[in-house]
Swiss-Prot record:
This is Neurexin 1. Residues 24-37, 1632-1646, 1831-1840 have a biased composition (Basic and acidic residues). Interacts (via C-terminal PDZ binding motif) with CASK (via PDZ domain). Interacts (via cytoplasmic domain) with apolpp/ApoLI; the interaction supports apolpp/ApoLI protein stability. Interact (via cytoplasmic domain) with Spn/Spinophilin. Interacts with RhoGAP100F/Syd-1 (via PDZ domain); RhoGAP100F/Syd-1 may recruit Nrx-1 to the presynaptic active zone. It comes from Drosophila melanogaster (Fruit fly). Keywords: Cell membrane, Cell projection, Disulfide bond, EGF-like domain, Membrane, Metal-binding, Postsynaptic cell membrane, Synapse, Transmembrane, Transmembrane helix, Zinc.
Length: 1840
């Protein structure tokens, strides 16, 4: 049926060519506007050489050619007008650029005129828009369908009217709109869907139709076709079954312009402007790939003029923030659809769509009341932002009938209930220590999606995400198909208690923003609709469409002693006031501190401070003339309740009120003005290195005690301050913009190792002073110093400037055997006697305090303390009050005599000495009454500073800090490591937990211990604002600490000599002791770095990830982080500043794969068995059970038996014996697989007596197990990961009764627990079907076949694939199934199959051959067009062993004429060949194509830049070959028989591609393929089944720019059209630009009738392929891009002679070497190929291991200087013919033992390929297997 069509096409083709030749030369402006890669039918369009060459350069080249050419007069005349044409073209092009400003996509209506765009996701309410312009009344505008079933959309012009024909399953509908639309003007078209309603709008005129049926989905998005504009790809002509409307292929193509194609191309995605489909979007698995689907920049756009290059939106899209650019005649405009921006270019941010709800207002719509149909969709989404202080309230409700979704705020968490069909689901997101009623904005997203599992069961996935961090997901399975919504309530309802699924009974109070409800592509912004007065939305109450930007009533919580806020200076003056509310349970803390500079006549700097001391409020006020300190509260206020404070002053007079009780006071001196020019500090004074000064009278500041509690309603001099806004932009981790109370924080005894827990404000305070441990929970070992009597430690405070204090607090622990010794001593300036001394005297502790001339001694300790045990000393001073306590004994108190508060109670401290008093410079002992200390000290805390920990973190160099300088001669003692605490095991690299944000704004303190055997993994990560982040990772067994404060990332690495992945505990400590000092300590390895940047704060945001991040986040991590997987192992003893969180109970984002405790290294450890094998402990060993791993071996590490299921359907079936059909209450199934199929059945288990079954399947790329044990279908799946990614996955399924679990790889375990009663027994398990399932109506057809690899299948410990290998009688293998090995070694993208190595002697390795698959999914390979994929150069191989055969020599019969071979590199003149210069010739390919299959198809030439391509066509019968080429006005034709040897090119030319073999009984034509570019030619081949001979033809072309059309005709009894990919050079091998021809002598075969003569035409300039077929005077043409060449005939002849001689010499040498090699290896037999043997023979000892293999570009580069011509291909082809015949060891025989391998000079064919009695090619020495259809994935390529 296709022969007449092909003939008609050929006639049309010839008519088009004839018409082209009689047309005048084409306009130059059209020529310039074409794509550089464009290939035209019209020869006149091939006149230009390269778009990169100027006209003058081309003209000068033409002048140089005249020196050696006889140019016809018509050519001279043509070139005289050439410059005129060029100038004219420039002017016309300039004018055309304005005319075609918005030309869009141009189509000329030719046979190959069409565009391909991404799939249209129609949903149930999708839209599609475009504009078109044409002058033709008929043409196909757009087409898309469901892949060939029922549904389609066809948009076409019919007699000037636009007709939409569509089918949604209920029958075709037709809508026609418009008339005379072919007027050359732009027309706008819209296709709108709304469930069953479909509308067509043209220029505002609308028509609509309704579709009848049960559902209105448009196919399935995964299998739907692309969108084709202007026409259909040609390959559909032979694949009509893939079209839902086959007649569309015969529609006339559109001729005109298309622009502004807008639609949604992803589920849930927004509409956007579409562009031509790019290469990464091309998928060739569903249908044969052809050039019509290749990207525009990599294929010649035949039939499309200029692409979209003149479209203003394409050249420069002015739209911002995702606006859709629309081209118009007046220029581009922007449509800001569904955006938060507007303006001309969508550049202005819209006012937020928000509203304030106060409990009586809400939004709603009810479609049922208006009689409208509900909104129906396959997926919907709800998203909004909310802010509230109320813990309960209805947020959103939607439903229809009994289906509902109720979203509310309950107890400060987000609560969701859903009912669908008969299933109900409920979730409550309330992370640990996190509440959402904190009056901060929170984002909520709810997404539902329905997936059809079977015809009666669907699966609804529900995902809820809060703040993009806190996630919960679940699913419901049942008999439903769609999601419906007819009612919606936002913010409340008339009676929220009556709504289905209600868990709260109150309306929402607070603010809502951007409330959006989307159903498929429908998107409703409900607040915007209400604000604009939409009739759809009903508004209850007086709704205010705005939210206050800030509220002074918003509270903040200071969570640590160091947390604080910095406010701008407070403008005070003579009168001022301050008021606020506070609450806390901690007795001490500085609340407000504001200072000013000292005035010239003032006594002191001005100051105001408010502190909480011993549970009371104290006011400090100094106007410069004297300080006053007043206690403002009469009772304690540290009771956890809110308290009000008001302070007012007028000059010196002031009064303060706490909870309404006023107290007046007056400042001393004559100062009346309070001028505060410094920052105001709230909650604390910051880290020790802050340059903040305060008087000694503010005791809490001296003791570094910040306020921990809540603060709100701050008003300064009548101005309300939104302190929550400051908290959000400053230290948001430590200062929370909310206030909540956590009671009983000491429950559960959080303090370890004997620490004492005290109730703080929402935090436990652990007193570790009586223990050997420190840290937030007394879990970390203390730093211990050892003194030997001559060692000491000295601390200079304030870098030697010293400090003045009225209070001191000291804690120190010691251990000694000496009765006396100096423990601690402070010193002041040399003229000051102030000091504090703590010493051991006679075995007791003495504290001596001296202020000026007053001194007081306290003695404590009832027993002797020099007992070499640890003792704790606590000392404190409050002005004149002293307190000393040793261990747990009652404290000793005392008071300094005759002191008053103020100057006389102030102590000057310049330095602190431990262990002894030494001179700073000379280190000689100064006069002291006490001996130096001998023993150990630890746990020193002096005025809130842990100096021993600071010194240890600074390392041995003791870098100076802004707050202190150190000198140390004592040594640190390595304390014995304690037991890890809060240990957790990360069982997978995909697991992680989330904690509250790391508190690292001013300082960093991170400690943890870890143990692992994995060398890499992310341990800690916290992102931040801008580029700030902090991360800790394990890289190659070493710790990397990376951070960025805004000055660029900095990475610190440990310098340990050992790798940390040794399954031992390792300690990591990270500190920031100074503003620019960072330290990393890993075990004993210490690193320190000092930065020079100006940024002082680490501004983090989000949560702190421990053990990894979610998988999609790795690609977004900063480039300085190398981890791409998480941590697997044990993590413990995590201390983060003042907190020690548990990785399980305190995680705000928990993980089921992170469990408490460390599954440590016992005999049966977690690492004993690989791949999650089950370790079984035995008496003195362990064993690994591998049934649930898909692996095997003693440790579950070895690969299991694997089978590959091809595209032609196949199945492995196991039938249980009748006596073994068991009833099972538990089932365990595991397997590994690799596939790219998005929909397939991997496994099905059936019952013999009931409908029970288990089916493991892939649905839309997700893995599901659906099982039924007597009641209903129960689906269980992993939705979060796609498995059709060609990667190896392991799935494990376990069932116990009705409950089941499924785990994919190392991801979270998915569990299913049916709520209703279900049967628990699977009855009479009868058979297992692997690779698909049988259809219900019979046992012959396989439904939903699997294509890929399945390995290690275990069903209840029964390894079915192992039984298949053992040929178990209960196993049946059907169809395209074969055993494979090396599954895990495969490339990620392609497959490699290999067979066991040869057992024959002398065989070093497997032989290999390569071919190409078709990529065809059809069952019948004859329906598939040949593969036309462009290779990457790194394809895979299929090793195949070829047994040795006896070497034979067959004499050649018949005529073998080198002149009949193809030319290579040279130009054929009058039937002779000559060598080309090496500057003109470029290498090609001389490889043989592997004969694989017969195929038929028809296509039109279309080429593109690509890599190696090979197509081999096998036909039977005697063939006469006629080859005709047309280039410009030139052509050539030849016919004849070709010699029986292959041809190999010399180094100065490309390899031959046109050699053939001929005997009286057969004709064989073989050529090779080169790597450069490909071209499609329309040709015909013949085949008959009665002949016993075979003809193999391969045509190749190498090109750098688009080649001309090639007409090749093979004449035979009947004509069968077929497609040929022409890769490489011209027919018969060529260089990049040499277009070679194959000529067959006339005297051997009669010529078929030639087409009519072609009228002469002005010859064009030399095309990009060089060489004119008929013009014999153009032999010296030099391809573009090359340097100068030889111009004289004598020089060329000399070069030819030199080349011939050199070729003969090299050939002789190679022949000798080859003969010697064959003699020395006579016992070996290989199937080799000529060029491979030579190319690798001189370089690679394994040359003979290469069989018939196509090559890639790198191979050609390697070989081109090592090969010489043969077979008439090169300059020395005839001279080498005899040598080639000597090497030729066989011919293609006609019988079972047949012989000839390849030919050519370097061939050593072993006769391995012959022909059987049936005429089919057969491997000699092998028993031929049963014929099996070959599919695209049976053979892969791997170029070596």
């Amino acid at each position: 049926m296709k022969a007449p069509h092909s003939a008609t096409y050929q006639d049309n083709y010839a008519d088009a060519a004839m018409t082209a030749r009689t047309r005048p030369s084409m306009d130059m402006d059209q020529q310039r506007n074409r794509n550089q890669a464009e290939l035209r039918l019209l020869p006149a369009q091939r006149t230009s050489t390269s778009a990169f060459e100027s006209p003058d350069l081309r003209f000068n080249k033409a002048r140089r050619r005249r020196r050696s050419e006889q140019v016809p007069p018509v050519v001279v005349e043509y070139r005289r007008s050439y410059r005129v044409l060029i100038v004219s073209a420039l002017l016309v092009s300039l004018a055309a650029s304005f005319v075609t400003l918005s030309a869009g996509f141009q189509l000329d209506g030719s046979q190959n005129s069409f565009y391909t765009f991404r799939k249209w996701y129609t949903g149930l309410n999708g839209t599609l828009e475009l504009e078109f312009k044409t002058e033709q009344p008929n043409g196909l505008v757009l087409y898309t369908d469901d892949g060939g079933t029922y549904d389609f959309f066809e948009l076409k012009l019919v007699e000037g009217a636009l007709r939409l024909r569509y089918n949604l399953g209920g029958g075709a509908q037709i809508i026609t709109v418009g008339r005379e639309l072919h007027d050359g003007h732009w027309h706008k078209v819209q296709v709108l869907r709304n469930d069953e309603q479909t509308s067509l709008i043209v220029d505002g005129v609308s028509q609509q139709r309704s579709t009848k049926g049960k559902e209105f989905q448009f196919g399935k998005f995964a299998s739907n076709s692309d969108v084709y504009v202007g026409g259909m790809p040609n390959w559909y002509s032979s694949k009509l079954a893939l079209l839902a409307l086959p007649s569309v292929i015969f529609e006339p193509r559109f001729r005109g312009a298309i622009r502004n194609l807008v639609y949604a191309d992803q589920p849930g995605g927004s509409t956007r402007r579409q562009e031509i489909k790019q290469q990464r979007d091309i998928k060739c698995g569903d249908v044969p790939c052809d050039h019509g689907e290749l990207p525009a920049r990599e294929r010649p756009l035949r039939g499309v003029r200029g692409g979209n290059t003149t479209d203003a939106c394409e050249r420069n899209d002015p739209c911002q923030h995702g606006g859709i650019c629309i081209s118009t005649d007046s220029g581009p405009i922007c449509e800001c659809r569904n955006l938060e921006y507007d303006g001309q270019y969508c550049e202005k941010e819209k006012a937020p769509s928000e509203a304030t709800f106060r409990g009586t207002q809400f939004l709603s719509y009810d479609l049922g009341q208006t009689g409208a149909e509900p909104i129906v969709s396959a997926q919907d989404a709800i998203s909004f932002y909310f802010r509230t202080r109320q813990p309960n309230g209805l947020l959103f409700y939607t439903g229809h009938g009994t289906d509902y979704l109720n979203l509310a705020l309950r107890d400060g968490g987000v609560s969701l209930t859903m009912g669908l069909a008969n299933g109900k689901q409920e979730m409550h997101i309330k992370p640990s220590k996190v509440r959402f009623d904190d009056h901060q904005w929170h984002k909520v997203t709810v997404h539902r999606r329905i997936q059809e599992i079977s015809s009666i069961t669907s699966f609804c996935r529900l995902v809820t995400v809060v703040d993009d961090v806190y996630t919960d997901h679940s699913h419901i399975a049942g008999k439903f198909t769609m999601l419906s919504s007819s009612r919606v309530y936002v913010g409340g309802a008339v009676n929220p208690r009556a709504l289905l699924g209600a868990r709260v009974h109150t309306n929402f109070v607070g603010c809502l923003r951007k409330v959006e409800f989307s159903a498929d592509t429908l998107n409703l912004n409900l607040i915007d609709l209400a604000k604009s007065g939409s009739k759809l939305i009903q508004v209850a109450g007086n709704l205010e469409y705005q939210c206050p930007s800030g509220d002074p009533q918003d509270p903040v919580t200071f969570t640590t002693r160091e947390s604080h806020l910095v406010l701008p200076p407070w403008e005070t003056g003579k009168q001022s006031s301050i008021s606020f509310k506070f609450r806390t349970k901690e007795p001490n803390g500085i609340i407000v501190l504001a200072t000013g500079s000292k005035q010239p006549r003032a006594k002191n700097p001005v100051l105001i401070a408010i502190e909480l001391l011993n549970g009371h409020i104290y006011i400090h006020l100094d106007l410069g003339s004297g300080a006053s300190k007043v206690r403002a509260s009469r009772r304690r206020v540290d009771d956890g309740d809110w308290h009000d404070l008001i302070l007012r002053r007028n000059g010196r007079d002031a009064k303060v009120s706490v909870d309404g009780v006023w107290n007046d006071f007056r400042t001393p001196g004559d100062g009346t003005i309070l001028e505060l020019d410094g920052h105001m500090y709230l909650g604390g004074v910051g880290p020790a290195y802050n340059s903040v000064s305060w008087p000694a009278a503010i005791w809490t500041a001296t003791l570094r005690q910040g306020f921990v509690g809540c603060l709100r309603d701050l008003v300064l001099s009548g101005k309300a301050i939104d302190i929550a806004a400051f908290a959000r932009v400053q230290d948001s981790a430590s200062v929370k913009p909310s206030c909540h109370v956590q009671a009983n924080v000491c429950n559960g005894n959080p303090c370890l190792n004997g620490g004492t827990c005290l109730e703080g404000w929402n935090r436990p305070i652990c007193d570790c002073s009586a223990t050997l441990y420190g840290g937030p929970t007394c879990g970390r070992e203390l730093a211990t110093l050892a003194f030997n009597g001559s060692q000491h430690m000295t601390i200079w405070l304030g870098n030697g400037q010293g400090t003045k204090t009225q209070t001191e607090e000291l804690v120190i622990r010691f251990k000694t055997s000496r009765p006396a010794g100096l423990l601690l001593l402070t010193s002041a300036e040399s003229n000051s006697p102030d000091r504090l001394e703590i010493a051991l005297v006679a075995g007791r502790v003495r504290a001596s305090v001296r202020l000026s001339d007053r001194e007081k001694n306290l003695l404590a300790g009832q027993s002797v303390l020099n007992d070499n045990n640890w003792h704790t000393i606590r000392f404190s001073r409050r002005a004149s009050n002293l307190r000393l306590q040793v261990d747990g004994a009652p404290p000793v108190r005392g008071m300094l005599s005759e002191t008053i508060l103020g100057r006389h109670s102030t102590m000057e401290i310049r330095s602190v000495h431990l262990g002894g008093l030494f001179h700073a410079e000379e280190e000689i002992q100064m006069t002291s009454t006490m001996p130096n200390f001998v023993g150990q000290m630890q746990g020193l805390v002096f005025n809130g500073q842990r100096y021993l920990d600071i010194v240890k973190s600074l390392g041995p160099e003791l870098s100076a800090l802004p707050s202190a300088t150190f000198k140390l001669t004592a040594r640190f003692v390595n304390s014995p490591a304690g037991q890890p605490y809060h240990a957790a095991t990360f069982r997978s690299k995909h697991s992680y937990v989330g904690l509250a944000m790391l508190k690292a704004y001013n300082s960093i303190s991170i400690d943890f211990r870890f143990k692992t055997v994995e060398p890499n993994g992310l341990l800690v990560f916290n992102g931040g604002r801008r580029n700030d982040f902090v991360a800790v990772e394990l890289v190659n067994g070493h710790i990397h600490y990376t951070f960025d404060l805004g000055d660029g990332p900095v990475t610190m690495r440990d310098k340990s000599r050992i790798h940390m992945n040794d399954n031992r505990w390792h300690q990591v400590s990270i500190r920031r002791p100074g503003p620019k000092t960072h330290t990393l300590t890993v075990d004993d390895s210490f690193e320190i770095i000092s930065l020079t940047g100006n940024n002082m704060h680490l501004e983090l945001a989000g949560i702190l990830y421990i053990g990894g991040v979610f998988k999609d986040m790795y690609s977004k991590l900063p480039a300085s982080i190398s981890s791409r997987s998480g941590f697997e192992g044990c993590l413990a003893s995590l201390d983060l500043g003042d907190a020690s969180p548990s990785l399980t109970s305190d995680a705000v984002v928990p993980s089921s794969l992170v469990v408490s405790g460390c599954e440590g290294p016992t005999k049966c450890s977690q690492n004993a068995c690989a791949n999650r094998g089950n370790c079984v402990q035995q008496w003195n060993a362990y064993a690994c059970e591998c049934d649930m791993t898909s692996y095997t071996g003693p440790t579950c590490y070895d690969e299991s038996i694997a089978y590959e299921f091809g595209n032609n359907k196949g199945m492995v079936q196991y039938t249980f014996p009748e006596n073994a059909q068991a009833d099972t209450e538990e089932d365990n199934i595991a397997l590994g697989f690799i596939t790219t199929r998005p929909d397939a059945v991997l496994l099905r288990v059936e019952s013999a007596t009931t409908q029970d079954y288990m089916e493991l399947e892939i649905v839309e790329g997700n893995i599901f197990m659906v099982y039924n044990i007597g009641s209903v279908d129960l689906p269980l799946g992993e939705i979060g990961t796609k498995v059709n990614d060609n990667a190896y996955h392991v799935v494990r399924f376990q069932r116990k009764g009705g409950n089941a679990t499924l785990q994919l790889d190392d991801y979270n375990v998915q569990a299913l627990t049916p709520q209703s009663h279900h049967s628990t027994v699977f009855n009479t398990m009868s058979n297992v079907q692997v690779g698909g399932k049988f259809s219900r109506n019979g046992r012959n057809r396989i439904e939903r076949p699997f294509a890929g690899v399945i390995a290690g299948l275990s069903v209840n410990k029964l390894r079915i694939l192992d039984l298949a290998v053992e040929r178990d009688p209960h196993i049946t293998i059907r169809g395209d199934v074969q055993l494979v090995t090396g599954v895990l070694d495969r490339n990620d993208l392609q497959r490699m199959q290999q067979t066991p190595a040869s057992g024959y002697p002398g065989a070093l390795d497997d032989l290999i051959f390569s071919g190409a698959g078709s990529g065809c999914r059809g069952d019948d390979e004859d329906e598939c067009t040949p593969p036309f994929e462009s290779g990457s150069g790194d394809d895979l191989i299929t090793p195949v062993y070829v047994p040795p055969t006896k070497q034979t020599t067959t004499s050649q019969q018949g005529n073998s004429l080198s002149t009949g071979g193809s030319s290579s590199g040279g130009v054929i003149t009058n039937g002779t060949e000559r060598a080309c210069d090496d500057e003109d010739c470029v290498h090609g390919s001389g490889d043989y194509g592997e004969t694989t299959e017969q195929f038929t198809s028809t296509s039109t030439a279309r080429g593109s830049e690509s890599n190696n391509e090979m197509v081999t066509i096998t036909t039977t019968g005697r063939s006469d070959v006629t080859t005709e080429q047309h280039q410009g006005s030139s052509s050539s034709s030849s016919s004849g028989s070709t010699p029986s040897y292959a041809t190999t090119q010399s180094s100065s030319s490309s390899s031959s591609g046109g050699s053939a073999a001929s005997t009286p009984g057969q004709v064989s034509t073989t050529s090779s393929v080169a790597t450069s570019s490909t071209q499609r030619a329309t040709s015909s081949s013949t085949s008959t089944s009665s002949s016993t001979t075979s003809t193999t033809t391969t045509t190749t072309t190498t090109q750098a720019t688009p080649p001309p059309e090639i007409r090749s005709t093979v004449t035979e009894r009947e004509t069968t059209p077929y497609d040929i990919y022409i890769a490489g050079g011209g027919m018969g091998g060529s260089g990049r630009n040499d277009h070679d021809r194959m000529q067959l002598p006339d005297e051997h075969h009669p010529l078929p009738p030639l087409p009519p003569p072609i009228p002469p035409q002005d010859p064009p300039p030399y095309g990009p392929y060089g060489g004119n077929t008929y013009n014999t005077n153009m032999n010296n043409y030099r391809p573009k891009g090359k340097g100068g060449r030889i111009n004289s005939i004598e020089e060329e002849r000399t070069a030819m002679i030199i080349g011939i001689v050199a070729g003969i010499l090299i050939a002789v040498v190679l022949v000798i070497l080859l003969v010697l090699w064959l003699k020395s290896n006579g016992d070996r037999g290989y199937k080799t190929e000529s060029e491979k043997a030579a190319a690798y023979g001189s370089h690679n000892p394994n040359a003979a291991l290469l069989g018939n293999t196509s090559t890639n570009g790198s191979y050609h580069q390697q070989r081109q200087h090592h090969m010489h011509g043969g077979g008439g291909g090169g300059g020395a082809g005839q001279q080498q013919h005899h040598a080639q015949q000597q090497m030729h060891n066989g011919h293609n025989g006609n019988g079972n033992g047949g012989g000839g391998g390849g030919g050519g000079m370097m061939s050593s064919g072993s006769g391995s390929l012959g022909y059987g009695s049936d005429g089919r090619p057969q491997m000699a020495g092998l028993v031929q297997p049963k014929a099996k259809k070959r599919d695209s994935k049976d053979v892969k390529e791997w170029y070596v």
